[in-house]
Amino acid sequence: AARPGVGKSTLGLDFMRSCSIRHRMASVIFSLEMSKSEIVMRLLSAEAKIKLSDMRSGRMSDDDWTRLARRMSEISEAPLFIDDSPNLTMMEIRAKARRLRQKANLKLIVVDYLQLMTSGKKYESRQVEVSEFSRHLKLLAKELEVPVVAISQLNRGPEQRTDKKPMLADLRESGCLTASTRILRADTGAEVAFGELMRSGERPMVWSLDERLRMVARPMINVFPSGRKEVFRLRLASGREVEATGSHPFMKFEGWTPLAQLKVGDRIAAPRRVPEPIDTQRMPESELISLARMIGDGSCLKNQPIRYEPVDEANLAAVTVSAAHSDGAAIRDDYLAARVPSLRPARQRLPRGRCTPIAAWLAGLGLFTKRSHEKCVPEAVFRAPNDQVALFLRHLWSAGGSVRWDPTNGQGRVYYGSTSRRLIDDVAQLLLRVGIFSWITHAPKLGGHDSWRLHIHGAKDQVRFLRHVGVHGAEAVAAQEMLRQLKGPVRNPNLDSAPKKVWAQVRNRLSAKQMMDIQLHEPTMWKHSPSRSRPHRAEARIEDRAIHELARGDAYWDTVVEITSIGDQHVFDGTVSGTHNFVANGISLHNSLEQDADVVILLHRPDAFDRDDPRGGEADFILAKHRNGPTKTVTVAHQLHLSRFANMAR
């Protein structure tokens, strides 16, 4: 594999010359780039050592003709087959290779080159289609017991780096993400950063969208570094953000689209709900309530009393009861200067160096000594089943959230505030577990920590929150009033809508069924992005699978509001088996595709990028992957004017 013009086809023909001319074993090249006459001319140039330009122009000397005559008989008798059929499919290659195996005892297959092959089938992205070609070629090699050389083109990664030497990551068509990007696990329900996966070597189950736009668990089979590249921060209307390279694909209604081709206003997929994790583990309810209260309104700094600041007596009572699990006592400070209760140490006196049970418990969860802007939700909460997630959110909201009815605008206001962006993201992730999509807003603060608010918009999601989560304490009265108001007609922002382009597909199906717009009782609906209910009603009439998946799937179509370059960074990516996508930072992203090849050779010519390079005339064969042996770099001489590479030792 190499960038264009480096000598990929020449190397493939060198393999064939060695196989068929020198060792008299049958080989075949399926060429989608060059015609049969071009290939023959290159073979003659390499064997007779005649300049290819002279052969093409006819400016051959007598010595050239003599050398050509000496080699012609051996070349013509070689069991070398050329197929330059246009638009070759994998099925045609397999059929022709099988016949040659039976007829001529085929020993080598060369395909030039992979990205020009077509399948005739519809794939979600070109990357997946090329990956399928690679997999089928490997199966062909296994079936015929013949080595298959698949020539492939690298992406533009080498051109964008100071060091132009190619890497294995350049062979993958997908983009890359920063080390801090957090992947949503399906086994534990928590998120894990790419950098952590690289350090640990763990390959977890992750949540992924299938072809029906439903969340399914799939294994992440590979995680790898992709070098240093320019990174862009993409921000959505919901406040979700992700940092990725320009080549990383995002899911639009039309299909997977690289970030570089996205623009403000485009709609891309994010999960609207997430199932329970595969490996759920219940927590004691007293621990869950204490944890929610300490995260929401608690203080647990080193060398200071562990405190909780309640907003009302009902919340204080909840903490007093739940604190018993850690052998602690929630005692009110009644002296004049005090205004909050304290969780005292254990009743017995502890030896020096020993911490209180509640401090040890918080330390085990990674929360002890965390300040407000550093707080997050521990993994144990994400592992809990959905009913306990709702209980945790109920007490967390009572400590740091708000639920009220706004009579002026006729809308409910449901939000949670914090100075920790990580905590806000964690709460948004937990809300997806109970089927609620939330929105994040940022409030900068001069001279202090910025704050964020997590909003729940829309009557449908607000009612779901009030019924399945709710709040504890004084806020419960306001919640009941809000629920009563939401039972009547209310303003609905209709943020949960499908991309407007879905109507083009609906209209095509209407035409095919000879139906008119009025038969859907909504003749003006084409002018706006439809709410999810409209495609649902349309799907019932036109019986279209894509509309059915859109109306019932787990994808929320969020809007791109900002794309900003943030400079070069070290980036990473992974491979998900089967569905080839995962959820990162609350957004559905495509993955990089695992290479099926047993051996990957990257071709590097220093003088291809710099004509004055001191290594002019040299080329490196970088053995970047070898399943059954070590990797190595071999330096050779390139004689591209003779259409060949030569051993440096000769």
Predicted regions and their residues:
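The conserved Walker
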Residues: 4
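Short, well-ordered loop/turn sites that connect or cap secondary structure elements
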Residues: 177, 194-201, 262, 574
